[in-house]
């Protein structure tokens, strides 16, 4: 064996918190735990067959793009931020996040295997490797993950979690608002629920880190973040046009993108970049985002985004003497 062993290894003690937010977020994430196998995606086969070939292709490409981003977040982003953690509990939260990002990526494969042919799947993954806009946004984020600035990593992560996913999330919410692919949309709501917590938590940790900087350093970081947002937004416009122009949906997607770009900035403690008038989300899509809009699957067939895990309480014979 070569090298020097660490002098001491510390066990994590959840009874001695350095930041109470770590436990709050841990409990939220573990309470939200889910797996795609519990969603009855096969119930969407009938409505999938009603989509045109162009609509099917766009849907598959959207989900493939989301798979790529989740893969990057699981294997590069969340893992890279573990080394930046200030508390052992933050490390634990980040390992949970990395695992759930892998669950998200696996979820799209569950959708594909249920609804799509092998050729459709293979064509979509080939497309994801060739699409310049998808590759560019992934490369921008991954480059910062592999850099040496912890706060830039966090800002990049928030941009991914709170902004870049949403040009893709629009599509299943659109279908759901029209009564199509409702179980698939329910799965996506579970993913959105996770990403909302991830974006909030990493943004909170970024703000905690910024508090230790000088005014000049904070100003530099704010300028960097705004430049990053506008670079990503310009690319995201091209990506949305590439995906949605043929269906005529692009003008509906762009306000939703701007709305979530502002949410990403808010998670980082910054003012919005886009006027409220330019961020008016289609009311039907907004309604579909409500977890209460999800399918309430029964206990045995599966669980939806509005599903509450069943509880039990032991009883005795006397409990039934009325």
Curated annotation (Swiss-Prot):
Oxidoreductase in keyword set: yes
Induction annotation: Expressed in growing cells (at protein level). Transcription not induced under oxygen-limiting conditions.
InterPro entries to which the protein is assigned, alphabetical: Ferritin-like_SF, RNR-like, RNR_NrdF-like, RNR_small, RNR_small_AS, RNR_small_fam
Superkingdom per UniProt: Bacteria
Function: Provides the precursors necessary for DNA synthesis. Catalyzes the biosynthesis of deoxyribonucleotides from the corresponding ribonucleotides. Two genes for this protein are present in M.tuberculosis; this is thought to not be the active form. When coexpressed in E.coli with nrdE the 2 proteins do not complement a temperature-sensitive E.coli mutant, whereas the other gene (nrdF2) does complement.
Family statement drawn from the similarity comment of this UniProt entry: Belongs to the ribonucleoside diphosphate reductase small chain family.
Keywords assigned: Deoxyribonucleotide synthesis, Iron, Metal-binding, Oxidoreductase
Quaternary structure and partners: Tetramer of two alpha and two beta subunits.
Residues the entry annotates as binding Fe cation 1: 70, 101, 104
Cofactor(s), names only, from the UniProt record: Fe cation
One GO MF term: ribonucleoside-diphosphate reductase activity, thioredoxin disulfide as acceptor
Protein name: Ribonucleoside-diphosphate reductase subunit beta nrdF1
Keyword Coiled coil: no
Reactions catalysed according to its record: a 2'-deoxyribonucleoside 5'-diphosphate + [thioredoxin]-disulfide + H2O = a ribonucleoside 5'-diphosphate + [thioredoxin]-dithiol
Cystines in this chain: none
Gene Ontology biological-process annotations: deoxyribonucleotide biosynthetic process
Entry binding sites for Fe cation 2: 101, 161, 195, 198
GO cellular component, one term: ribonucleoside-diphosphate reductase complex
One Pfam entry name: Ribonuc_red_sm
Active site residues according to the UniProt entry: 108
Listed EC numbers: 1.17.4.1
Annotated cofactor note: Binds 2 iron ions per subunit.
């Amino acid at each position: 064996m070569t090298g020097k062993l660490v002098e001491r290894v510390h066990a994590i003690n959840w009874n001695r918190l350095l930041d109470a937010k770590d436990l709050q977020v841990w409990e939220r994430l573990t309470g939200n735990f889910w797996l795609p196998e519990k969603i009855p995606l096969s119930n969407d086969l009938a409505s999938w067959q009603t989509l045109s070939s162009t609509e099917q292709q766009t849907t598959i490409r959207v989900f493939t793009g989301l798979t790529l981003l989740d893969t990057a977040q699981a294997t590069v982003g969340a893992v890279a931020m573990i080394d930046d953690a200030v508390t052992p509990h933050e490390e634990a939260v980040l390992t949970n996040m990395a695992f759930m990002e892998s669950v998200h990526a696996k979820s799209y494969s569950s959708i594909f295997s249920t609804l799509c042919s092998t050729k459709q799947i293979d064509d979509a993954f080939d497309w994801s490797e060739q699409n310049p806009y998808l590759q560019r946004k992934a490369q921008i984020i991954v480059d910062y993950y592999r850099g040496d600035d912890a706060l830039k990593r966090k800002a990049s992560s928030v941009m991914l979690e709170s902004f870049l996913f949403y040009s893709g999330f629009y599509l299943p919410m659109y279908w759901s608002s029209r009564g199509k692919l409702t179980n698939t949309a329910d799965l996506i709501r579970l993913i959105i629920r996770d990403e909302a917590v991830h974006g909030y938590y990493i943004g909170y940790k970024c703000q905690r880190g910024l508090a230790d900087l000088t005014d000049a350093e904070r100003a530099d970081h704010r300028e960097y973040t705004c430049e990053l947002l506008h670079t990503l937004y310009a690319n995201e416009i091209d990506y949305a046009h590439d995906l949605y122009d043929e269906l005529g949906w692009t003008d509906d997607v762009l306000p939703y993108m701007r709305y979530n770009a502002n949410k990403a900035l808010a998670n980082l403690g910054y003012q919005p970049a886009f006027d409220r008038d330019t961020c008016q989300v289609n009311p039907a899509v907004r309604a579909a985002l409500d977890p209460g809009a999800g399918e309430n699957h029964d206990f045995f067939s599966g669980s939806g985004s509005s599903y509450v895990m069943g509880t039990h309480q032991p009883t005795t014979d006397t409990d039934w003497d009325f």
